[in-house]
Amino acid sequence: MGAWAMLYGVSMLCVLDLGQPSVVEEPGCGPGKVQNGSGNNTRCCSLYAPGKEDCPKERCICVTPEYHCGDPQCKICKHYPCQPGQRVESQGDIVFGFRCVACAMGTFSAGRDGHCRLWTNCSQFGFLTMFPGNKTHNAVCIPEPLPTEQYGHLTVIFLVMAACIFFLTTVQLGLHIWQLRRQHMCPRETQPFAEVQLSAEDACSFQFPEEERGEQTEEKCHLGGRWP
C-alpha cells in the first residue's frame, strides 16, 4: 500500500511540473546592469533610473554583435557592421545614423562588432610585452625572463650534468671496446695451449714403449747371465 501511495505522489508531481510553463533564463548583463528587450533588441543598461526601461545615452549597449542603439534612449538596436580596427560612431539627436571611425591609440577591434577595446597592459600582470598591439590586434604578453643569477646557477648545473654524462659514456664505450678486443684475442691464445697439451700427451704415450723396452733389455741381461 505504501509503494502505491509513493508512486501516485511521484506521478502527481510530474503532472504538476509539466503543467507549469517553462522559464528560459537569458544570460545576465553582470552586476550593476539590467537586461532589457529581446532578440536583436536585447540591451544591457546600467541601473540609472529604477522602474524605467529606457536609459540615457551611453548607458546602454546592444548585446547582439554588430547591433547598436538607434536612438538616445536606446529603445531599438540597429545593425551596422564595421571593419576590424574601426568602431561605430553615432550621429544625430533623435534617430541615430552611423559611421565607422578608426580605433583610438591604445585600443583595438578584432571583429566587425564596431567596439574598440583597450590593449592588455602586460606590465600590470608582471609580464613582458612581446607585441605592443595595433588597431586590429591585442597586445601579446610573455613571462618575464629569470634573473641573471638564476641563469648562472642553471648554466653551472647543466654543465655539470653534461660532464657527468660525457664521462659515463666514455667509460662505457671503453669497456665495450676492451671486451671486443678480448673476444678477438682469446681464440688465438687457446690454439697454442691446445697444441702444447697434445704434445705433452703424445710424449707421455711414447714413453710407455721405451719403459717396456728397458724392462725387456733388463730381463734379457739377467737371462744372458744365467747361460754359460
UniProtKB/Swiss-Prot annotation:
Disulfide bridges in this chain: C29-C44, C62-C74, C69-C82, C103-C122, C116-C141
GO cellular component: external side of plasma membrane; extracellular region
Keywords, in A-Z order: Apoptosis, Cell membrane, Disulfide bond, Glycoprotein, Membrane, Receptor, Repeat, Secreted, Signal, Transmembrane, Transmembrane helix
GO biological process: apoptotic process; negative regulation of apoptotic process; positive regulation of cell adhesion
Outcome, altering E201R: No effect on binding to SIVA1
Gene Ontology molecular function: any one: tumor necrosis factor receptor activity
Cell inner membrane recorded as keyword: no
Keyword Transcription: no
Tissue: Preferentially expressed in activated T lymphocytes.
Glycosylation sites: N36, N40, N121, N134
Record field: transmembrane: 154-174
InterPro entries associated with the record: TNFR/NGFR_Cys_rich_reg (IPR001368), TNFR_18 (IPR022318), TNFRSF18 (IPR053107), TNFRSF18_N (IPR034018)
Function: Receptor for TNFSF18. Seems to be involved in interactions between activated T-lymphocytes and endothelial cells and in the regulation of T-cell receptor-mediated cell death. Mediated NF-kappa-B activation via the TRAF2/NIK pathway.
Protein name (record): Tumor necrosis factor receptor superfamily member 18
Organism: Mus musculus (Mouse)
Source lineage: Eukaryota, Metazoa, Chordata, Craniata, Vertebrata
